[in-house]
């Protein structure tokens, strides 16, 4: 595989406290059932985060390539983790807009989604992210 990538930009809106249906934030925002089922891990730092996955056959679509929802979910999660690293405690974020461009498919191997905060305003945080495979 070549080292082409998937590019993604995101805008997140900051939310303070509980929202509709009294949803309570997870005590560990880097771990949730869907993430555990898919099997990717998250590492975050100051203004950045990376989601990593060892792709196997369960992640492939009927055409033998990674289902597009897998890297998309990893990107969204990494970007959310990057945002959470720069916003005040007690706040959380929700994605308000995502634009993706899939440049080529990925197969079995290792993929990483790396997100970096580009600009953090008072209510909206802009994040850039990219998926690479090895």
Regions found by a protein language model. Name each.
Residues 1-134:
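Terminal targeting signals and extreme-terminal segments of soluble enzymes
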């Amino acid at each position: 595989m070549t080292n082409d990538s998937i590019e993604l930009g995101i805008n997140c809106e900051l939310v303070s406290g509980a929202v509709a249906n009294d949803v309570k934030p997870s005590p560990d925002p880097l771990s949730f059932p869907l993430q555990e089922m898919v099997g990717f891990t998250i590492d975050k730092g100051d203004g950045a985060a990376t989601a990593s996955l060892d792709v196997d056959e369960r992640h492939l679509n009927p055409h033998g390539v990674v289902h597009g929802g897998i890297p998309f979910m990893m990107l969204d999660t990494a970007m959310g983790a990057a945002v959470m690293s720069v916003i005040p405690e007690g706040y959380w974020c929700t994605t308000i807009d995502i634009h993706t461009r899939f440049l080529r498919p990925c197969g079995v191997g290792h993929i990483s989604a790396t997100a970096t905060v580009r600009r953090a305003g008072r209510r909206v945080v802009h994040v850039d992210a990219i998926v690479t495979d090895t």
